[in-house]
Amino acid sequence: MLILTRRVGETLMIGDEVTVTVLGVKGNQVRIGVNAPKEVSVHREEIYMRIQAEKGNGGVASGNY
C-alpha cells in the first residue's frame, strides 16, 4: 500500500485521468473529491461491497439502503 500525506487543497493523480483532492479535514473525517472519467466507477467501499454481494445473489438486493 502506498501511503501519502496531503494537505487541504492538494491533489494526487491515479493514472492519467483520475484525480483525488483533499477538500477538508474536520476531526477524524476527511472530505475528498474524485474526478474520473464516466467509464470509471467510484464508490465508497461499503457501497462497492454491497454491489458485489448483489451480483453474487443474481442481482437481488439483500439489505436496506
UniProtKB/Swiss-Prot annotation:
One GO CC term, this protein: cytosol
Molecular-function annotations in GO: mRNA 5'-UTR binding
A GO biological-process term: negative regulation of translational initiation
Protein keywords: Activator, Cytoplasm, Repressor, RNA-binding, Translation regulation
Subcellular location as annotated: Cytoplasm
InterPro entries in the record: CsrA, CsrA_sf
Domain of life: Bacteria
HAMAP family noted in UniProt: CsrA
Quaternary structure annotation from Swiss-Prot or TrEMBL: Homodimer; the beta-strands of each monomer intercalate to form a hydrophobic core, while the alpha-helices form wings that extend away from the core.
Similarity-based family: Belongs to the CsrA/RsmA family.
Name of the protein in question: Translational regulator CsrA
Organism: Vibrio cholerae serotype O1 (strain ATCC 39315 / El Tor Inaba N16961)
Lineage: Bacteria, Pseudomonadati, Pseudomonadota, Gammaproteobacteria, Vibrionales
